Amino acid sequence: MAALRGGDLRPRLTQGSRGTERRVTQESFPEIREAVRKLCARFPGAYWRDLDRERAYPTEFVRALTEAGFLSVLIPEEYGGSGLGLRAATAVLEEIHRSGCNGGACHAQMYTMGTVLRHGTPAQKQAYLPKIATGELRLQAFGVTEPDAGTDTTRITTFAKKVGDKYVVNGRKLWISRAEHSDLMVLLCRTSLRDEAKTSAGMSVLLVDMREAKGNGLTITPVRTMLNHATTELLFEDLEVPAENLVGEEGRGFKYILDGMNAERILIAAECIGDARFFIDRASQYAKDRVVFGRPIGENQGVQFPLARAYVQMTSASLMVDKAAELFEAGEPCGAEANMGKLVASEASWFAADMCLQTHGGFGFAEEYDIERKFRETRLYQVAPISTNLILSHVATHVLGQPKSF
C-alpha cells in the first residue's frame, strides 16, 4: 500500500459491520480501517505467539506499518507525513488491536514525536521529522519514569549538567519501553535542583541519539515482564548530549511533556477499544459455535449477559474516546476527557477480556486461541500509562474540586 497522504483517506462515516455484529454507532475512517485489517491479516496469531515466547520485537510488523504510512498519520505533510490527525491515528490503533495484533511496539512513534513537532526548533523538525515519517529514524523511546519517580514525575533525579556546548547526563530510568529498538529518545531530566515551591520547574527535554549513546554513557538492561513489551532500565553515566539537542527552553520540559500526554491517553484508549472488540468478536463467535448439552452455549443468558455488558461498556467507552479526540483536534482543553476516556476504555477492555476467557473456559488458556496473550496485554492499561487510581484522583481534584489527596 502506498504511504498515506492527507487527501487520500479523509473521514467518511459509514454503517460498516464486522462479522454478524450490527453496529449501533458510526465507524469513522472506514478506508483506513480496512487497509489496517488487510495489513494485520499478514501477521496472524502464530506470528505473535512466536514473538511472545521469545519476548522478541515485531520488526516485520513495525516495518510494514511504517511503509504503509500508518505511523506517520500525525506528522504534517510538509514533513513527509499524512497530517490526518488524532482521530485517524485512533482508528489505526483500534484496528491493529481488534485484529489480534499489538501496537505497543510502535505506538510511541505516533505521540512522542509531538514534543519535537510542537516545541522543537525549525532545524530540529527538518532534521528529524521527515526521517521519522519514512522510518529511517525510529523515535520509540520516551524516557520519563524512574525507580523512585513514577506517578510523581516531579521527583525525577536524572540530571543533565550544562558543560560548554553539551549536557552531561547522569541518573537512572525504569520502565522505558522500546529503548533497544529506538534510534532516538525523548528524555526528561533535571537541569536545576528541585524547588519545593515550584516542583514542576527545572526539568528539560533532550533528544538523545541512542545509536551514539549506547556504550558511551548509556547502558540498557532489559526487564522481563508478564508480557512482551520490550521494556528496559536505563543507566546514564556521564552521557554527553549536544546542547543543540535541547528541545524548547531549558526548565520548561515538564510542560512540554504534559502537552503530549493527552494524545498518549487517547491513543492508548483506542488500543483498549480495539482489544475489547477483539474479545467480544471472539467470545460472540465461540458462543455460537460451542455446543454443550445439545445446544450452543450462546443460548444461555449466563453467557449472553456478560457478552452484552462487554459490548455496552465498549461502545460507551468508544464514544468517550471519540469525544476526547475531537476536542484534541479542535485545540480545545481535553485533559479530563482524555483521562476519563482512557480509564473507561481500559476497564471496558479488561471486563471484555475476563468475559472472553470465561466464555471459552479451558480453551481460553490455550496459547493457540490467542486469548491468554491478549488477556495479559490488555491488563497493562489499567496501570500504564497513568494508573486508574491517578486518573480518579485527577477527576476528583481537577473536575470535582475536591482537596488534593496526594
Each predicted region: which residue ranges?
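Flexible, small-/acidic-enriched active-site or ligand-binding loops
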Residues: 155-157, 212-240
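A short, Trp-centered hydrophobic/proline-enriched beta-strand micro-motif
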Residues: 135-144, 188
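Hydrophobic, small-residue-rich alpha-helical packing segments that form membrane-like cores
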Residues: 150-152, 167
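A short core secondary-structure module
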Residues: 3, 166, 170-217
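Alpha-helical interface subdomain recognition
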Residues: 3-4, 8-9, 13-104, 111, ...
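Long, acidic (Asp/Glu-rich), low-complexity accessory segments flanking structured domains
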Residues: 238-255
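Short beta-strand-to-turn element immediately C-terminal to the catalytic PLP-Schiff-base lysine
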Residues: 118-120, 161, 187-191, 207-209, ...
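Short Ser/Thr-interspersed hydrophobic loop/turn segments at strand-loop and sheet-helix junctions
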Residues: 69, 92-97, 189-190, 207-213, ...
